[in-house]
């Protein structure tokens, strides 16, 4: 496993954070993608990698359901996939340990949640190595129960004029970890949950690969709970 700059806390001087290093390894950055359903995020990442727009390889797909349609995307791309069903485990910790043991065996550098609907406990060796995308601007419309169309329904019910998506590091609370980047999407007067979801997903398709590119390039640096993007 390579040393990746964003894993370790940054050093501090009086006026903030400095010392951004870069990874010396030139081997492809290895991702595990966690899915629960249709795998639209997985498909987007496969397409970006195939087009040369993301310098990474998907080493493993982990699905929480044997019937997840996203498993077909993994099969089509000849990506190893495994099903880890929550019902087969007595506790969340046991379920989580099984997922991350598969990730260890696959030698992944980063775990990417792509519509993964099961809560996991992130082990110490994967702290700041799990990322998630949420279809709203955290800290709004997020947390337990806010997923899928429920998010967009809440946005419309509240009457906000701007929504969007947030890529963040995952921790052991829902939609809580440090924010890497966000993209804004205007809410239109005639929007429905379906039309709004479609536009937010288009923003997600650009934001997630961009966040991964920043991580892979070693440009993501922590300053307390804030994420700073170092110059290229």
Regions found by a protein language model. Name each.
Residues 2-232:
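One-carbon transfer enzymes
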